[in-house]
From Swiss-Prot:
Ranges annotated as biased composition (Polar residues): 208-217
MF annotations from Gene Ontology: RNA binding
Sites marked Important for efficient shutoff activity: L28, L65, K202, K203, K206
Annotated signal sequence range: none
Any GO BP: viral RNA genome replication
Domain statement: The probable endonuclease active site in the N-terminus and the basic amino acid cluster in the C-terminus are important for the shutoff activity. The C-terminus acts as a nuclear localization signal. The C-terminus is recruited to host protein complexes involved in nuclear Pol II RNA processing.
Entry keyword Magnesium: no
Organism of provenance: Influenza A virus (strain A/USA:Iowa/1943 H1N1)
The protein's role, per its UniProt record: Plays a major role in the shutoff of the host protein expression by cleaving mRNAs probably via an endonuclease activity. This host shutoff allows the virus to escape from the host antiviral response. Hijacks host RNA splicing machinery to selectively target host RNAs containing introns for destruction. This may explain the preferential degradation of RNAs that have undergone co- or post-transcriptional processing.
Gene3D superfamilies per record: Influenza RNA-dependent RNA polymerase subunit PA, endonuclease domain
Designated name of the protein: Protein PA-X
Compartmental location: Host cytoplasm; Host nucleus
Residues the record marks as active site: E80, D108
Family: Belongs to the influenza viruses PA-X family.
Length: 252
């Protein structure tokens, strides 16, 4: 699974996932399914934000080829992917600036158009079950919840899906591709079932003992959202020339 993750996801996403697991004292060599899940969640958060801006009139617009002369503000502030200290700094800054209620738990995004925090979920189970788990944990009507599944299903608070249909379709297609690639490598069952995951882990560890890992070729294409992951996180003047560059798993 670890090799698959490094092949399938952008190196910057992999690096952020590694840092997140290290921060919580988790070993990606052992928790390989969690490693894959974190990378998937990160990519969905970035894709959610990609190409969405607010123009001078305060309207939400989609810009794929970007006009460097346009004064555009990113519609979504990305909170996921930051270390906890910086993430809470971002949240506090948003609350102080917008008057939004401070959430009890760290959300994934903030939507400047709808003025609300968003919790993104990616599940291998039934979307309604995962949605209820999220809602029971957050216990706040102020945080908007949007759940995606690997089967193309989704569920959101009050059936408000925030994004246009095409943007959501890109996310669903990416998740379906990840599922298909996992299945083709015999990894999907272990990704879904904890019991199968333990069996696969023992098999992988035994395999690693028998042979050294070969060099891995990775995709260098970068999502536009990843290009703005920098210290000046809250800079509202950020503008960039964007291009459609969604990641695809390399063929076997």
């Amino acid at each position: 699974m670890e090799d698959f993750v490094r092949q399938c996801f952008n190196p910057m996403i992999v690096e952020l996932a590694e840092k997140a697991m290290k921060e919580y004292g988790e070993d990606l060599k052992i928790e390989t399914n969690k490693f894959a899940a974190i990378c998937t969640h990160l990519e969905v958060c970035f894709m959610y934000s990609d190409f969405h801006f607010i123009n001078e009139q305060g309207e939400s617009i989609i810009v794929e080829l970007g006009d460097p002369n346009a004064l555009l503000k990113h519609r979504f502030e990305i909170i996921e992917g930051r270390d906890r200290t910086m993430a809470w700094t971002v949240v506090n800054s948003i609350c102080n600036t917008t008057g939004a209620e401070k959430p009890k738990f760290l959300p994934d995004l903030y939507d400047y158009k709808e003025n609300r925090f968003i919790e993104i979920g990616v599940t291998r189970r039934e979307v309604h079950i995962y949605y209820l788990e999220k809602a029971n944990k957050i216990k706040s009507e102020k945080t908007h919840i949007h759940i995606f599944s690997f089967t193309g299903e989704e569920m959101a608070t009050k059936a408000d899906y925030t994004l246009d249909e095409e943007s959501r379709a890109r996310i669903k297609t990416r998740l379906f591709t990840i599922r298909q690639e996992m299945a083709s490598r015999g990894l999907w069952d272990s990704f879904v079932s904890p019991r199968e995951a333990k069996r696969q882990l023992k098999k992988d560890l035994k395999s690693q003992e028998q042979c050294a890992s070969s060099p891995t070729k990775v995709s260098r294409r970068t999502s536009p959202a990843l290009k703005i992951l920098e210290p000046m996180w809250m800079d509202s003047s950020r503008t960039a020339t964007l291009r459609a560059s969604f990641l695809k798993c390399p063929k076997k």
